Swiss-Prot record:
Its cofactor is Mg(2+). Mg(2+) binds at residues 244, 291, 318. The gene is eno. It is an enzyme of class 4 (lyase). This is Enolase.
Length: 434
């Protein structure tokens, strides 16, 4: 029987050497589910709470023993005494939400709740003898996502003097995921050669992208375009560009202050000037997606950006929407953004994650399944991307095992799906005038 007999959590480490939580779910049948929870560096203020211990004598205050204790001493007894089956995903998720009793999961911690939620799903897949993506998506989950590859890191993810947090390449012209991954890897390695030729650093940031001391945003973009061409690919046809501006990280007192990351060369821009600047970049370069181009609370700015660019560029809300259906609903009603970034730990359960994806897709918004800057070897987001036919995944650069693990899982899934596997490429951006 798939009745849950034990739930156990422990403190482990993420890709930055910071503590995170791992949860295991055991059943009468012997089926097992294990999940590790990611962590973000730049976080939206409306995200669900990641519970940390705050004990400066352990891991500089970043320990997660409280979250571990909440799983082992509060959540686990409720599940075991309730005779829950691993197939009761929605019921278990709703029980944990009620047990927490707060709007932001601040009592038990979203990291504690999410670890259990994913581990339950993995145990269910193990019990049924099917891959996780098939358990979550049934026979409909056949679309491999376009990878959004973060090959240059800036902002809060590196020490590079660039305000924008991520510069991404999207190999939309590839015939399948396997080739898209190869294209990305070849761009990455060609970029390394170019950087070495300029005596620039090839050290990598949190998400595996390079973090050299470029002379500014346009220098970074021009260098990436050079790498695309060096890989034998055509910008604007085979490969498009994307930014994660993470604008909330440098928005202060109503001003987008690039000097926070770029020093004396950084400009200060008003909300309208920020929109103008992003439009200039879109007009100049083959950019297909911009994430968090405006501050999470600058709804007027977001609306202006959407009115200006929303028909030709994917405008992704990360800090804006934080995988929250209530906030997403407001965005849909007000015509703000046209895409949502999906981060499982922003909301805290698989059930709520799937609800956000469904709401977005029904409204004609795209959904981009995403990692966090503090990752683990857990590959759940790869399965979620396929299960929901999200069409896009953002899981870092072409280095660091914590990033590559997700890409390798997608390669396995593509092989398993065989002839039923789909890769839509440019058509994954279904709400743009291409």
């Amino acid at each position: 029987m798939p009745i849950i007999t034990d739930v156990y959590a422990r403190e482990v480490l993420d890709s930055r050497g910071n503590p995170t939580i791992e949860v295991e779910v055991f059943t009468e049948s012997g089926a097992l589910g294990r999940a590790l929870v990611p962590s973000g560096a730049s976080t939206g203020e409306h995200e669900a709470v990641e519970l940390r211990d705050g004990d400066k004598d352990r891991y500089m205050g970043k320990g997660v023993l409280k979250a571990v204790e909440n799983v082992n001493e509060i959540i686990a007894p409720e599940i075991i005494e309730g005779d829950f089956s691993v197939l009761d995903q929605v019921s278990i998720d709703k029980m944990m939400i009620a047990l927490d009793g707060t709007d932001n999961k601040g009592k038990l911690g979203a990291n504690a709740i999410l670890g259990v939620s994913i581990a339950v799903a993995r145990a269910a897949a193990d019990y049924l003898g099917v891959p996780l993506y098939k358990y979550l998506g049934g026979f409909n989950g056949t679309e491999l996502p376009v990878p959004m590859m973060n090959i240059v890191n800036g902002g809060s993810h590196s020490d590079a003097p660039i305000a924008f947090q991520e510069f991404m390449v999207l190999p939309v012209g590839a015939p399948n995921f396997k080739e898209a991954l190869r294209w990305g890897a070849e761009i990455f390695h060609n970029l390394a050669k170019i950087l070495k030729g300029r005596n620039l650093s090839t050290a990598v940031g949190d998400e595996g992208g390079f973090a050299p001391t470029f002379e500014g945003t346009e220098d970074a973009v021009e260098t990436i375009l050079e790498a695309i061409k060096a890989a034998g690919l055509e910008p604007g046809k085979d490969v498009f560009l994307g930014f994660d501006c993470a604008a909330s990280e440098f928005f202060e007192n109503g001003v987008y202050d690039y000097a926070k990351f770029e020093g004396e060369n950084g400009k200060k821009r008003t909300s309208s000037e920020q929109v103008d600047y992003l439009e200039e970049l879109v007009d100049k370069y083959p950019i297909i997606t911009i994430e968090d181009g405006m501050d999470e609370n600058d709804w007027e700015g977001w609306k202006a950006l959407t009115d200006r660019l929303g028909n030709k560029v994917q405008l992704v809300g990360d800090d804006l929407f934080v995988t929250n259906t209530k906030i997403l609903e407001r965005g849909i009603n007000e015509g703000v953004g046209n895409s949502i970034l999906i981060k499982v730990n922003q909301i805290g359960t698989l059930t709520e994650t799937f609800e956000a994806i469904e709401m977005a897709q029904k409204a004609g918004y795209t959904a981009v399944v995403s990692h966090r800057s503090g990752e683990t070897e857990d590959t759940t987001i790869a399965d979620i991307a396929v299960a929901t036919n999200a069409g896009q995944i953002k899981t870092g650069s072409l280095s660091r095992t914590d990033r590559i693990a997700k890409y390798n899982q997608l390669l396995r899934i593509e092989d398993e799906l065989f002839e039923t596997a789909k890769f839509k490429g440019l058509n994954a951006f279904y709400n743009l005038n291409k």
